Amino acid sequence: MKKKNISLLLVTLLVMLSSCSEFYSDEQYEHYVSFKAPTSTVSRIRLKYRKGQPSPYRLPLIVAGSTMNNKDIDVHVGIDNDTLDIYNYEHYYEREDLYYKQLPENFYSIPNYDIHIPAGECQALMDINFNFNGLDLSEKWVLPLIIKDDPSYNYTSHPRKNFNNALLWITPFNDFSGNYGTTALNVFPEDTNKPLVVDTREAYVVDENTIFFYAGAIKEKRTDRKSVV
């Protein structure tokens, strides 16, 4: 009796799995277009500092869905002038000195804002060239991008919040930048013999062969941090 019940259960499961497979193969799922970047936050993009040369970056765009993209899509990308302001206020409120700043247009170039994704493909790359010469790298610079929507377009951007935009925090590096262990560095505050110990310090790029870091035990969120570089 038990063997019959087990056999019947296995047959039922096979029928259910077969039905599910047929259901998904015929599923009419909307193919939403989005950036492949972390959502609800800025995406830190680390790029090699190149003196007198652009620093290239390729941002992926993807077509979401449980079935393969079956049509040619031309995705229209633009500069998002609103989301960064909202993000800054939601995360830092009145601390405007901590705000990310929008990267001026003379420090980047985008060869083509229209990205083609052919049928049978679910991803394409958007080329961006950054130029750091003359940029104040003590600030946090962000390039905010958005996927445009219009009834005339043959695609729909992802409806979930933050999926159709990307906040690219541009962080250049050179051969000397990065995190350094500083446990041997003792900082003595005024009127005390007890040292303040900082475990690590991050060194930031100035140019191809130069770095800077904040002196002593200065925290990067202090309002006067620029005066102690």
PLM region spans:
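C-terminal motif of bacterial Sec signal peptides marking the signal peptidase cleavage site
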Residues: 16-19
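Residue-level recognition of beta-strand termini and adjacent short loop/turns
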Residues: 191, 197-223
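Beta-sandwich strand segments
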Residues: 151-164
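Sec-dependent signal peptide recognition
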Residues: 4-11
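Acidic/polar, low-complexity intrinsically disordered N-terminal segments immediately downstream
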Residues: 21-112, 117, 121-123, 135-141, ...
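Conserved small/polar residues in nucleotide/adenosyl-binding loops
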Residues: 228-229
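Tryptophan-anchored aromatic micro-motifs
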Residues: 174-191
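A short beta-strand micro-motif common to beta-rich folds, especially ectodomain repeats
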Residues: 126-128, 139-150
